[in-house]
Amino acid sequence: MSVLLEVKDLKVSYGSIMAVKGLSLTVNQGEIVTLIGSNGAGKSTTLRTISGLLKPISGSIVFDGQEIAGKAGHEIVAKGLCQSPEGRRIFPRMSVRENLDLGAFLRNDKVAIEADRERVLDLFPKLRERYEQKGGTMSGGEQQMLAVARALMGAPKLLLLDEPSMGLAPVLVDMIFETIIKIREQGITILLIEQNASAALDVADRAYVLESGLIKMSGVASDLAKDEAVTKAYLGG
């Protein structure tokens, strides 16, 4: 199994606060890997740095054989790494169709774009029903579907998902995680950050536990789900 993403000794700060303190992780082609930890552990900071929204102090981020640390976000998207950000962040005054168009803004392969549009609308049938509806008028669950669908329109090799179940009703949480599995079945590798550690460990192949900007544990997700320390800290055990 080939390594698609390799992060080594990543350090990231917000002003004088060191948010990520030497993090290393790998994501192999075809995997779902989850990064779990409490609020403020540095999970979203890690994803934002990988996707080019933040610049690291030091460290290496190699994606698909190329160093991307410190590169602009649009350059990273063009290489096939796309993020669905925390809090959905769709364009509320634009329709579903227009949001999806923006997801593909760096692409010029029109036939492939239309094929991907049909694929994401099949994945999220509600978006087909709401195709010309403005994003801001949709429910939270529908907006989350749109945020993920927009990221998929970038034709990612690696999809970064930041808290996809945040604020959703339990039935929608189940639907989102079922969809994550379907996305992987389409050949897309996934790095997932999720406050719902139990659900994340259920769908992931491997997991990393992040505390105060440092990786404290890592391993096969199903093994970590049974670990006493993980159970007590993150699974309500």
Describe the role of every protein-language-model region.
Residues 2-237:
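Glycine-rich phosphate-binding loops of nucleotide-dependent enzymes
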